[in-house]
């Protein structure tokens, strides 16, 4: 029996929480704006 690992897939991660995915929605743009304001080095995944 194979063991199920909890390693995520990069494509799914990028599609849901990548920069371009964030810019598509108005709330996503708010997230980017808030992270810029806070001075985050990484704005998105």
UniProtKB/Swiss-Prot annotation:
The keyword Ribosomal protein applies. GO terms for molecular function: structural constituent of ribosome. Residues 1-10 have a biased composition (Polar residues). One of its GO terms (biological process) is translation. InterPro entries: Ribosomal_bL34 (IPR000271). Belongs to the bacterial ribosomal protein bL34 family. This is Large ribosomal subunit protein bL34.
């Amino acid at each position: 029996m194979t063991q199920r690992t909890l390693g995520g897939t990069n494509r799914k991660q990028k599609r849901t929480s990548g920069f371009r995915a964030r810019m598509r929605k108005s709330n996503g743009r708010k997230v980017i704006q808030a992270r810029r304001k806070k001075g985050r080095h990484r704005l998105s995944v």
